Each structure stands twice: as structure tokens, then as C-alpha cells.
Amino acid sequence: MISIFSKLKQSLSKTSNKISKGIDKIFYKKKLDTETLEELEELLIASDMSVSVVTNIIEEFKKVKFDKEIDSDTVKEALAELIEQQLSKSEIPFTLNENKLNVILVCGVNGAGKTTTIGKLAAMYGMQGKKVAVAACDTFRAAAVNQLSTWVDRANALLITGEESADPASVAYRAMEESIKQNIDILFIDTAGRLHNKKNLMDELSKIVKVIKKLDENAPTHSVLVIDAITGQNTYNQVEHFNDATNLTGLIVTKLDGSAKAGVLVGVVQKFNLPVYFIGIGEKIEDLKIFNRHDFAKSLVGL
């Protein structure tokens, strides 16, 4: 059976191959000097890490005491450690309250894997013996409700829907009322992801938060943004907009197995001080993994 680390390494191969081969080329029979450091800097920026993160890494890299003869594996080891340091704020666990309803507001643009991620989380917590409900608040997209229904059936969870085009906030409110009545442990709220009209969407999300606070002033327990690793630099804009609307508590990064831009995750964590709760490295339920910065950093450089 393939280990979690091996699966992660395999999933990050599109990014890591670029970085690993680039390092091999830069440091083939060359010493560490200004020229090779500049080439390394360019390579890391090309992997979608932000300029500020790469600058930090290079500055720290200069302080590392290397032997005169340096090989690419030594560079990769040092680089992995420095990337791990940049991710120091990323490993806050996704904690849940005991004996109380946990309301998880899940945001993300259409196509990011939001609905699928909710289905996987519902199944995962259902297998742990939790009572799970899902509120279908993307009421203007019938396909979203159908997709959610398939996942919720698999997870043996409760699906709470509204009429087509119903006010999403009213569906969220009713779902929360129903969850309290039925002693549900976790309520996932699936939201719309239409970014072509940002103001309406963000107002809709803000309204959902306002409405559920009427039933519990501490709700939501978590506001999570699902981001697609393939998106690259546009991820920064997404995090900024959704954070303004919902005060995000953390991120879930999907489709790492199909992205050559996984380096963007490092920059996003640094800029917004948000943890990464889970990462998606495949289609199966068990391919949604708790984020581990040490394994991620090593896999990113091809170790």
C-alpha cells in the first residue's frame, strides 16, 4: 500500500520535477555564488512562490554553512528546511467543539472542488462516528445540489436544501435550526462560488454569517476557503475577497495532484497568516489529507 508521503510526493511531481531538475541543472559542477543564487531565486519565483517568500528563503539560504563542494541534494535539503520554516503558521489543527454543534462555512469559486471536499469531509467525520449535516446554500445552481446529494448519500449524512433560487441565508438558518434539533455534531454549509459578480457573492456570504449568528453568536466555528492549486497567482485575490466577507479561519487546497503551481501555497500562508487544514491529492475520500508542512516542503523540492 502506498504511504501518505509517497502519495504526496507523487501528487506534487508537476511542481517538484520543475524545481528538482532546475536545482540539478543550476548546481551541476558549480559552486554556490551570486550567479547560482540568482538562478535559484528565479526558479523558485517561477514555481509560483511569491517574491517576498523567495527573498526570505534566499536571504536565509545565504546564512547556511555549506562545504565548498556543494551538490544538488544538499541544496534541496537546505531548501526544504527553509520552506518548512516559511510554513510555520500553516499547521494549526482543524479543531471541533465537543457536545456542541460545529458550523463549518465552506467557500470557494466554482470548480475549486468545494462540493466534493464537503462530501469527503462529511464521509470522513461520519466514519469517526459524528452526526453530520450539509446545507445546500448554492440555491441558484441545481447541479450543485445534485452533486452534493450524491456525496451526502455516500456519507450517510443529512442534506438540508431549499427551493431553487431561495435565499441562501434562509437555507443556512433553517439548516442550523434543524441541526440543533437533531443534535448534529457538524453542519457543513456549502455556498455559491460565482465570482463574475463579486459584490453580490460577498454580500451573500456576509449575510449567511450574520443570520447564523442569531442562533449562535460564535458561529461559524470555522470559515474555510477551498482553493484549487492549479489557479496559481490568482489564489491571492480569491483569499483576499473571501477573507473580507467571512473572516476566514483556514484553507483547504485541492487538486495538488494536477498542479505545477503548488508553490503558491507557501506565499498564501505567509501573506494571510492562515493555516492549511487539509490538502487534496486525489479523487478518493482518503485522498483528503491533514496538511503536514514537513512532508509538503520535502515533496515540493523532490526529496
Swiss-Prot record:
Its EC number is 3.6.5.4. One of its GO terms (cellular component) is cytoplasm. It comes from Rickettsia felis (strain ATCC VR-1525 / URRWXCal2). GTP binds at residues 108-115, 190-194, 254-257. Coiled coil: none annotated. Keywords: Cell inner membrane, Cell membrane, Cytoplasm, GTP-binding, Hydrolase, Membrane, Nucleotide-binding, Receptor. CDD domains: FtsY (cd17874). This is Signal recognition particle receptor FtsY. NCBIfam families: ftsY. It catalyses: GTP + H2O = GDP + phosphate + H(+). It is a peripheral membrane protein. It is found in: Cell inner membrane; Cytoplasm. GO terms for biological process: SRP-dependent cotranslational protein targeting to membrane. Pfam families: SRP54, SRP54_N. HAMAP family: FtsY. Part of the signal recognition particle protein translocation system, which is composed of SRP and FtsY. SRP is a ribonucleoprotein composed of Ffh and a 4.5S RNA molecule. Involved in targeting and insertion of nascent membrane proteins into the cytoplasmic membrane. Acts as a receptor for the complex formed by the signal recognition particle (SRP) and the ribosome-nascent chain (RNC). Interaction with SRP-RNC leads to the transfer of the RNC complex to the Sec translocase for insertion into the membrane, the hydrolysis of GTP by both Ffh and FtsY, and the dissociation of the SRP-FtsY complex into the individual components. Belongs to the GTP-binding SRP family. FtsY subfamily. Its main location: membrane. The gene is ftsY. GO terms for molecular function: ATP hydrolysis activity; GTP binding; GTPase activity; signal recognition particle binding.
